[in-house]
Amino acid sequence: MTELEKYYNKFNEEKRLTRRHGNVEYVTSMKYIHKYLEQMEKPAILDVGAGTGRYSVALAEEGYDVTAVELVKYNLGILKAKKSSVKAYQGNAMKLSRFANESFDLVLVFGPMYHLYTFEDKLKVLLEAKRVAKKGGVIAVAYCMNEFSVITHAFKENFAKQSVKDGKLSKDFHCQTTKEDLYSYVRIEDINEKKYL
């Protein structure tokens, strides 16, 4: 069992997007998802890193054709227990080989980028999402934002000095993470780097 699987066996992913700040993320994401779906005729949706199915189940209940891929068996079990019409599979975001090229109108990548540490792994996920997305389709990607972590952990919880001392926070307030931290934090300028384009 990987460290990520151990983490999600303890962490309550099911409640994350129903809590106050998580609900803001969910409502905002759904607003943009619906904006794009309204422009599509009978869209096929792929939710990569679907967790326990917060997005995929809701979209399936709205009548959309939804397929979900989740790495963590525990989360996948919760998703499948919801008895929705979502076609759910265990899989890795870096290798979506079960799906043909250009299969989906909308590809959601809301979980995987949180946990990928290297540029190469992040690029693999983006390239796989691009491969399975139809020409003219939409790929929506979410990241863990550096500033949120700095504001909550470093300042609100008063760990700024200790984080700098431990090498977890640079003097310009950029989170310094390793693979063992399980989360990767980025800034807007990191996402917009030319090497991703």
Regions found by a protein language model. Give the residues of each.
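Class I SAM-dependent methyltransferase SAM/SAH-binding core
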Residues: 54-95
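A short acidic, Gly/Pro-enriched loop at the edge of an enzyme's catalytic core
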Residues: 97-107
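A short glycine-rich, Lys/Arg-flanked "PGG" loop and its adjoining helix->strand segment in the class I
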Residues: 123-135
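A short SAM/SAH-binding and catalytic strip from SAM-dependent methyltransferases
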Residues: 106-120
